[in-house]
Amino acid sequence: MNSSIVSQHFFISLKSSLDLQCWKSSSPSSISMGEFKGIHDKLQILKLPLTMSDRGLSKISCSLSLQTEKLRYDNDDNDDLELHEELIPKHIALIMDGNRRWAKAKGLEVYEGHKLIIPKLKEICDISSKLGIQVITAFAFSTENWKRSKEEVDFLMQLFEEFFNEFLRFGVRVSVIGCKSNLPMTLQKCIALTEETTKGNKGLHLVIALNYGGYYDILQATKSIVNKAMNGLLDVEDINKNLFEQELESKCPNPDLLIRTGGEQRVSNFLLWQLAYTEFYFTNTLFPDFGEKDLKKAILNFQQRHRRFGGHTY
């Protein structure tokens, strides 16, 4: 039986067995919160009239859980997004995409979209702190973004200076990863002052990836290890995963959840090593429109997944 026929029969049987009234056809289009919560538990005991291995059923179950924007909740009120406190991701990586498209859609200059980075990140930090999230790593400017027009790059560099001045007294700890030496000197000074001033802040840690790329991070870590080995500071036999991670610029646990706004579904050279076992969530919402409801939806989606880290929990 080919995979498309198996999937079709699977969803028909699932609809009947679980009494999912919102499924009008053989594939899920909209599902209520209450219906979604118990699906995975019921899948384990569901008897389907299919000739399929347990592994095949698990694959379809996983495929179902990985739907992001395709599973639409019937009620979008924030209060109805019941998050489990014990399953809140400790570290969220954030690709803030869609600022330029947001501005263009409103007939504005692209700079107007970029300007919203500061208030929007403040909002996300405030919500994240209340939810118990410990770290937010936000992708602000990549090593490839230098290819943009000089006017846009100059505007962004000035905007980042304003950003760090704003976050001096916002109450969160701020640190920067990326190649700072290539940034304007005035921006480097703003970064140094903000990192020093906020290093003692408790609670949320906001990491800004600025002139950062995953390739760059892996290469600089490799060069550092090679240099130490050549100077007799470590033996080649001592090189392992833990040692390598100590040389990466991110000095905190790897992200549990990656959120990318703006509809694109790729990581764009962001935290390539660190995202090995991170759960991905992609949303069509443009970053300037991304708010509390959207963040909670992403976290709820994360909480409904089975994180196996290469193992098997079924």
From Swiss-Prot:
GO terms classed as biological process: plastid membrane organization; polyprenol biosynthetic process; response to cold
Domain of life, per lineage: Eukaryota
Gene Ontology molecular functions: dimethylallylcistransferase activity; magnesium ion binding; prenyltransferase activity
Record's GO cellular component terms: chloroplast; chloroplast stroma
Compartments reported by the entry: Plastid, Chloroplast
Residue range of the transit peptide in the UniProt record, numbered on this chain: 1-61
pH effects: Optimum pH is 8.0-8.5.
EC number of the protein: 2.5.1.142
SUPFAM superfamilies associated with the record: Undecaprenyl diphosphate synthase
UniProt-annotated catalytic positions: 97
Top-level EC class: transferase
Function: Uses dimethylallyl diphosphate and isopentenyl diphosphate to catalyze the cis-prenyl chain elongation and produce the 20 carbon product nerylneryl diphosphate.
Protein's UniProt name: Nerylneryl diphosphate synthase CPT2, chloroplastic
